[in-house]
Amino acid sequence: MNIILFGPPGAGKGTQAQSIVKKHNYFQLSTGNLLRDEVKSKTELGADIEKLISNGKFVSDEIVNTLLRQSLTNLKYRDRIIFDGYPRNVEQATNLEIILKEFNQTIGHTIFLNVSRDIIEKRIMGRMTCEKCNMTLNEYFNKEEIELHPCGVEHLKKRNDDNLDIIISRYDTYMSSTKPVLDFYSKNSNFTEIDGAGEIDQITNKINEILKV
């Protein structure tokens, strides 16, 4: 069964997608990667995509649909895909259903990792990275680990590029544009909303339970 996993920036989609890939032998399909791979392949379509991107223009749904169809012809992907970053709107969601139907496939589960903006802010702005061992901790969620960090607290530094205004803007834009998609999928019995504010392992366990059904 194919899976759609979506949620706002900072919700932990990438972490959970990788967990599903490893544990359940799935393939993570990102439209961004599809576009980049097509450009690298030096095809005529890839050249068109590169031109659009370099000119700051959006790649049309028609092109994305073509790449999705190409991927679905690969039998190793059959009913083993995690759709990452797609669909982003209702038209894309409708297109995806049509394309999957062409290949006698469906979406088995749609999982939404819901995380409040407050938690996202703390996750991003509270990040501290050890300049010696590169371990990443969070001053809001890992207070005890920070105090006991073997390299010493003095080596934990915050990143300069964690810009709160950018994070807030991305979050608000995502939630606004995704609301219609949520409404589209939430009517289905295979839709599950998970509180993405919990511990990573707890969220992973919830997803694993869902995939057993």
Predicted regions, residues:
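Glycine-rich phosphate-binding loop of ATP-dependent small-molecule kinases
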Residues: 1-213
